Structures are given as C-alpha cells and as structure tokens.
Amino acid sequence: MERIKNFTSSKMDHCVHMFVNQLNTLRSSRASPSILDTILIDYLGQKIQLKKLSNIIVENVNTLRITLFDPKIKNNVEKAIISSKLDLIPIFINNYFQIKIPVLTEERRLQLIKLAKKMAENSRICIRNIRRLSNEKIKLFLKDKIISSDKERRLQHEVQDITNSYMEKINVILSKKEKDLLK
C-alpha cells in the first residue's frame, strides 16, 4: 500500500515540477535566462532550445547576454527571439546578443497573473486526476479482496492528505509568482 502513496506522491511531484517550469517562462521585470527557455532555433534542420546552443547570463537587473556557440546561427537566433511573443529585441554587439528586458506595464502584469492562474488550475486538475487514479487502484484492491474496507478508507484518506499538501504547494508557488509579477 506504500506503493500507492509513493505513486501518488511521485506523480503529483511531477505536476508541481511542470508547473514551476511553466511559471519560469513567464517574464517579470527582472532579467532571467529561464524566460528564453521556450525559444527554439532552426539548427541543422532541427528545432533546438536556445539555451543548448548558447551561454545565457544575466548581465544586470534588466539585461541578458547571449553568447552563441556557433556564430553562424546569429540570424536564426535573432529571428526566433523577435518572433517569440516575449516582446524582446535582441541587439548584436561584438560576438554576443544583448537583450534589454523592458519594464512590464500594469496591463501586461495583469495578463501574466491571469496566465499564471490558468497554469495553476491546470496543475490542480493534473493533481486531482492522479488522486482519482490512486483511488481507483485502492477500490480495485478492495474488490480483489487484497485490502479490507477499513484499510480502503484509511488509504483514501491518506491519498487525500497527499493531494491537499500538493494543492497547497501549487497555491504557495502561485502566490510567490503573483507577488514577483506585481513588483
């Protein structure tokens, strides 16, 4: 029965991890290399993440520096950054791109918060689906007489406790991101 709890926790952990990764792609007013995670570059006939083709560092609070491993892809990188919906403009200086992160408008901040809330709700749905799967497995064990009805209720209660803790994690992470976006 520990297997069910471990299954539930590991799958819910994955949902939270995916949520955090999604939130990291939302840009705030501060420069962060993770805002470029979704940018894909045409390289040798494949779409490859920019971070795998370059070194991305934070130059200062509102500036990123992108140093390409292969300078021949300069035009592809520039095109990909401009065509992304991040409102970023790359400037090529010497052998690197410099990207100034513009200050977010109040309207854009509210849009990003709304998007973050939608991502949080999708993560909550993921967690509830995992809870449902775990409860179905528990009911199957009861049906096959592997566990008693008392054990079934106890396991379902434990699965619910695990679910509640992961829902709280989602809420805490969302709250931190909202505060970050409102700065």
Swiss-Prot record:
This entry carries the following GO cellular component terms, namely: cytosol
Where is this protein localized, as stated in its record? Cytoplasm
For this chain, the family text in UniProt reads: Belongs to the RRF family.
Q: What organism is recorded for this protein?
A: Buchnera aphidicola subsp. Baizongia pistaciae (strain Bp)
Q: Which domain of life is it from?
A: Bacteria
- GO MF terms on file? ribosomal large subunit binding
Q: What does this protein do?
A: Responsible for the release of ribosomes from messenger RNA at the termination of protein biosynthesis. May increase the efficiency of translation by recycling ribosomes from one round of translation to another.
Q: What is this protein called?
A: Ribosome-recycling factor
What biological process terms from GO does the record include? Answer: cytoplasmic translational termination
Q: Which UniProt keywords apply?
A: Cytoplasm, Protein biosynthesis
